[in-house]
Amino acid sequence: MMKTGFPKDFLWGGAMASSQAEGAFLQDGKGLDTQDLRYFDPNWTKEERTQKSNRRMNDEKFKAALADLEDLEHYPFRHGIDFYNRWQEDLELFAELGIKVLRTSICWARIFPNGDDAQPNEAGLKFYMDLFDACHAHGIKVFATILHYNIPLHLVTEYGGWKSRKTVECYVRYTRTLFERLGDRVDYWLPFNEFNAGKFNPYNGVCLIEDQEEDYQNAIFQCL
């Protein structure tokens, strides 16, 4: 007879990204990251929301986003669901659901605000320490994504983002810091989310500003 049902140790879980959930985009030492500049118009139609032109970043959009850091309506990643300040109550709800694993990403700019800082931001590390400790206290395993699109904005403006080996070096240092400081709290690691996003959504995936590139397609390839 065919067995049905799930194995006893099957991991029922949930997932989110730091940029989608945390908010608090300049709180406790966090630096600006690339997702903080993603524009959204609440009046867009369903079709407009998926248009490639609205998902791409250009110089005009980039400068406009930096010029108004108080605009939360058109830059929703800046506030998310305020998970950074309300994670305890959200975690209680996760536990009520009976989930056994939580996949969330770690925000690079919360650990190294500029990406190339000499020392990590201790407030950022403490946030993830407390969150992951609480997950385990609720019997929830931690599945941590090291990079879910967003990188510190400084790495884009100073070095050109993923086109530069400097950004790769900073990523390695960031990753090593996570392993050293959070390694005993994380059950599973994922180095990159949707590695192929660089092709179908270049600003998300590899943080390119389209009209700053002489050869856009070649720049995407170089980043990947």
What is the meaning of each model-derived region?
Residues L72-R86, G161-K166:
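Active-site mouth loops of central-metabolism enzymes
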Residues G80-L91, P113, G124:
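Internal amphipathic alpha-helical repeat/solenoid segments
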Residues I106-P120:
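Glycine-rich, proline-tolerant flexible connector loops at the mouths of alpha/beta enzymes
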Residues R86-C107:
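Catalytic domains of carbohydrate-active enzymes, especially glycoside hydrolases
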